[in-house]
A protein has these predicted regions:
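Positively charged n-region of N-terminal signal peptides that target proteins for export
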Residues: 1-5
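Bacterial N-terminal signal peptides
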Residues: 8-15
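Extended active-site neighborhood of metal-dependent phosphoesterases/phosphodiesterases
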Residues: 90-92, 97-102, 114-116, 179-243, ...
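Membrane-embedded segments
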Residues: 106-108, 120-208, 213-216
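Beta-strand-turn-beta hairpins that frame and shape the catalytic cleft
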Residues: 108, 117-130, 215-216, 223-236, ...
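Active-site neighborhood of phospho(di)ester-bond hydrolases with catalytic His/Asp-centered motifs
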Residues: 132-133, 160-166, 189-196, 218-221, ...
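Conserved beta-sheet core of the metallophosphoesterase superfamily
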Residues: 182, 267-346, 350-352
Length: 352
């Protein structure tokens, strides 16, 4: 995080201290998180709008003004995109969220998606996927928060746990982290890809430790989840920042008839390269901006601005992508307007 944003952060802290909210608004380090649903009723709409997360949109809102005008002829731009997506891809996606910050110290909310697609096998109707990313243990996420995260994940009763990388802030934290996460037992196991932090340090140790605890690291590999004679595919991307080595997506050799979930650290990858045969991509890296005030994030970890900042988006090929805010932090242990979250996805088969 660059020094130029320190005045911005100071101004933000002063603003928060002056707010009238009396419920779960923390203005002191090390954990600074503000959720829209924690603003009391007498707080003005202006203040409430400052920190409103924009994760649950049904389309990428960075469309041209001309496209917006065309869409408004019959319906809103979001509805127009949703309708088009239903026709062209046989897909329907809805979302909701649950505030858990009063119960779990490590996570602020659970964001739930119902993902309906024509290629979901009948055996996987109602299949539940838990997705976490960017734990950065021990940054904002400390031991108590990690234990609470584990309790929350166990309570979700997921069928599989997927992880998006950037696990640690030091190699000494690798074993304690995965030892705790190993308590989360799911019928289909735990899969994970590496983040940029994990390639900078501790990569081999993370791979060994994951395998030691029965987890499955995916480095440009695919694995098959089987149930009642049917299957879905998990495709994991190795270092998505090195396109020279990894610019060929592991999904290219897969069948378009399979339901394929791509697991990748940065959302930019789904736009940088062809990810054909992918039905749903999951990514992290952006932290949802980590600090967002007046709808502005001073640091964007994407070459595409706010297009893939958080929540549901689409690449140019109209492949859906869910980007999580993640859980931990980098540089400074502060989150404002970008709540730490767990993603839960329930698969449904489109009945045509």
């Amino acid at each position: 995080m660059k020094k130029s944003i320190y005045p911005f952060l100071l101004l933000t802290l002063l603003l928060l201290v002056s707010c009238k909210s009396k419920k779960r608004m923390v203005a002191t380090l090390p954990r600074l998180v503000l959720n829209t649903d924690s603003i009391v009723a007498d707080t003005s709409n202006v203040i409430a709008g400052l920190f409103a997360p924009d994760h649950s949109q049904l389309k990428d809102l960075n469309v041209s003004k001309g496209r917006k005008r065309r869409a408004k002829k019959n319906k809103s731009s979001a509805d127009a995109y949703k309708s088009e997506d239903w026709v062209l891809r046989g897909t329907k996606i809805t979302s909701s969220e649950v505030d858990v910050s009063s119960v779990y110290s490590g996570v602020d909310r659970v964001v739930k998606y119902d993902f309906t697609h024509r290629d979901v096998p009948e055996a996987f109707e109602g299949f539940r996927i838990a997705f976490i990313s960017d734990l950065h243990y021990k940054s904002l996420l400390k031991e108590k928060g990690l234990n609470d995260l584990v309790r929350l994940l166990i309570a979700q009763k997921a069928d599989v746990l997927l992880m998006g990388g950037d696990y640690q802030e030091g190699c000494e934290y690798v074993d304690p982290l995965f030892s705790a996460l190993a308590r989360v037992k799911t019928p289909m196991g735990t899969y994970g890809v590496m983040g940029n932090n994990d390639y900078e340090r501790c990569h081999d140790e993370i791979i060994r430790t994951m395998k030691h605890y029965g987890m499955h690291p995916l480095e440009h590999e695919v694995d098959t989840l089987r149930k009642d004679g049917q299957q879905i595919i998990i495709a994991g991307v190795r270092n998505p920042f090195d396109l020279g080595q990894n610019g060929k997506s592991p999904t290219l050799a897969l069948s378009p008839r399979d339901f394929v979930i791509m697991l990748v650290h940065t959302p930019d990858y789904v736009e940088d390269v062809s990810v054909v045969n992918t039905d749903l991509a999951l990514a992290g890296h952006t932290h949802g901006g980590q600090v967002r005030v007046f709808g502005i994030a001073p640091v964007l970890n994407s070459n595409y601005g706010t297009r893939f900042l958080t929540g549901l988006a689409y690449n140019s090929a109209k492949i859906p992508l869910i980007v999580t805010n993640g859980i931990g932090t980098s540089q400074l242990p502060i989150r404002i307007g970008a709540p730490a979250e767990v993603i839960m996805i329930t698969l449904h088969r489109l009945k045509e």
